[in-house]
Each structure stands twice: as C-alpha cells, then as structure tokens.
From Swiss-Prot:
Superkingdom, natural source: Bacteria
Reaction equation(s) it catalyzes: L-glutamyl-tRNA(Gln) + L-glutamine + ATP + H2O = L-glutaminyl-tRNA(Gln) + L-glutamate + ADP + phosphate + H(+); L-aspartyl-tRNA(Asn) + L-glutamine + ATP + H2O = L-asparaginyl-tRNA(Asn) + L-glutamate + ADP + phosphate + 2 H(+)
One Pfam match: GatC
Entry protein name: Aspartyl/glutamyl-tRNA(Asn/Gln) amidotransferase subunit C
Family matches, as SUPFAM superfamilies: Glu-tRNAGln amidotransferase C subunit
Amino acid sequence: MKITQEEVTHVANLSKLRFSEEETAAFATTLSKIVDMVELLGEVDTTGVAPTTTMADRKTVLRPDVVEEGTDRDRLFKNVPEQDNYYIKVPAILDDGGDA
C-alpha cells in the first residue's frame, strides 16, 4: 500500500507539525515500507500456532481501590502563577485555537 505525500501532510497538519517537502517524501516512503511489511506478515501461514494474547509472563498486580485524602487544593495552587476558578492558565501553544 502506498502512502502518499498528501496523506503525510494531512496527518502532519492534524498534529500541528510542519515538514519540508523532502521530509514529507521521506516519511511517505518509509511509512509505505512499514505498511508493506505489516501486510506481508498477514500472509504468513500460522496454521497450528497457538494464539498469543500477551508477551508478559507476569500476572497483573492491582492495588486495592481505597479512598485516600488528597492534597488540599489551595496548597496545590499556592505556586501557580496564573489561575482562574481553580483552573491553571497556561500560554496558548496553537496558533489557530487548536481545532483539528
């Protein structure tokens, strides 16, 4: 499957990333090779091979779900430079408001 430069540019724009034309071409080529390799793996005959659901041989260890007293909100906001109604204000990082 061929990944086009237009697709790379589209995803980059959604991610608020900018690449040169050379970088976009390189990404398209590399991603196409990755997708081709994954498709090739789909052709492997796995008849008689037991499905693998996890690679970890450890059991998941869960902690008890216990309510604990948290840190006081006023104490948490003591060193916050700018806030509004217990929301921390930070500088904008997206030029156009951030809508994808």
